[in-house]
Amino acid sequence: MKQGFIKVAAATPDIRVADVPFNTKQICSAIEEAQNNQAKIVVFPELCVTGYTCGDLFTQDVLLQAAKQALLEITEFTREKDMLVFVGVPLVVDAKLYNVVAALCRGEILGLTTKTFLPNYGEFYEMRQFTAGPDVPGEILFNGKKVPFGPGLLFQASSMEELIVSAEICEDVWSPIPPSIRAAMEGATVIVNCSASDETIGKDSYRRELIKGQSARLIAGYIYANAGEGESTTDLVFGGHNLIAENGSILAEAKRFENQIIYTELDIKRIVGERRKNTTFTMAKEKVLPRISFPLDVCEIKLTREFPKKPFVPQDEKERALRCEEILTIQAMGLKKRLLHTHANTAVVGISGGLDSTLALIVTAKAFDMIGKDKKEILAITMPCFGTTDRTYRNACKMAEQLGATLREVKIADSVSLHFQDIGHDPKDHSVTYENAQARERTQVLMDIANATNGMVIGTGDMSELALGWATYNGDHMSMYGVNASVPKTLVRHLVKYAADVTADPKLQEVLYDVLDTPVSPELLPPKDGDIAQKTEDLVGPYELHDFYLYFMLRFGYEPGKIYRLAVQTFEGVYEKETILKWLTTFCRRFFNQQFKRSCLPDGPKIGTVALSPRGDWRMPSDACAQVWMRDLEKISL
């Protein structure tokens, strides 16, 4: 439960219809197994103590008494268990039979949640035996003790106040207004569903989308435990289709037609953070659902949940291709609007033969195609200087030619040398002044050419560079429209690769592939033996790490210690712990002290959930202190 993670389980035990003693043993065995796997919340199917398919046997007092006794036995079995258990059971209250989920913890029945919506159509006829639960929760006397009874009961962990669990039962989630909606609005961060949903053709897909969608709508974790093998097959088959979702993502899913327990970790801090950020997720003004406190030890667990190395890049190849096409279109549409609005005659792109300027040129060409404008009006400017290599220079020229742009070369070495003379800088001093003078000279050239041609300077810098401040202030940092400003470096590479893969021009494809093979570099220092001497990732760290840090820091507001924990797990065998911590420290420090560059960014289109525009997604003061974040890093022990 440290850093918000809690291990949860959805269990489908082997049962026998109406064989309550057998079912009780199976449930207790599953509880034991779940505890051995460090699960803190365990959810069982609907009416699993007796079996869902007992039919009119539910009218038999002997079965109902056996179920009540079984509930007491299972409750006692949890006494030494540090977990919250939800189990489905039929229960008679005031001569009426209710379909109930019992919440159990450390030998106590915390509450009895009733089923609200009883299906009575098709293969279902629950109203024949059961009564729908009351409209509002209350209390009943059970085994000599008062116990909360009714819909939407909230169970809150005393050791982690953000962990609030509520239950609903099968059909409840299929209804127009599921009880979980009210529960979430009153604070529930995890919904459990004890279900008995039979298998018919295509129903698994609908069920999966339903649970995924409900977790997204509620911004919650959702644990769905379904009945499986052992239920009667007189008319139906149950597949044990268990699902665990979090805010629109399926984290764990059982293989159907095999009784099993599935596990994953829910991130409660992430859920709470998303709700806090989402201003349309409003909490109920009037609280009507009771909160029942339960104890749970705080401990660190080994994470089994996987996190993507490249969170900005879809892992599935087909989805990645679709996403790349969509992103390129968004970028081009943004630029198209700006070109038309300003009545610009030309688009001026500084090209270096690197990834970012390549993507900017591709996007500009696409925008011109959308407008129906001659791509000769794209002015691709190459500005070789002290650090330019033959490889990048050739690639820049070939690319401009194959895309149909007008190539212009402006050598800036003499201008920069004269500038050094003017300001009294020694050209042998390869300090930041040496580097930034070149970047600013290039920007001046581009701006002046744009003025001379009634054009617009297209920015090439990407979001990863902006996060790190890896840009020269008022140099490559500045443009008239930044098409790459919301594209992280790891995604830039895939966008260029996608463009290479789909082009029908073999010469363009060849040059794009060579750009992909070229080390990332600003080329501001002289080359060594004709090769790039200044490699960005040697200086500021691997971009795949920085993009990982950027995503989890901005998307979910994770603290550095939590990001470090996820990175160590995700990049195990790729980077040492020391390396991960070193570059995470660099990221946090630079992210704060380079905000002044982001505070005056040019306009540019947003393309994803993480963006750094000071006018939109990220409004941060330039003089904020990083001390709290750095102290969190200092707590990490290697």
Each language-model region and where it sits:
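Enzyme catalytic cores with a strong preference for nitrogen-chemistry domains
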Residues: 1-350, 366-375, 407
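ATP/NTP-dependent adenylation/nucleotidyl-transfer catalytic domains that generate, transfer
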Residues: 7, 161-163, 220, 229-232, ...
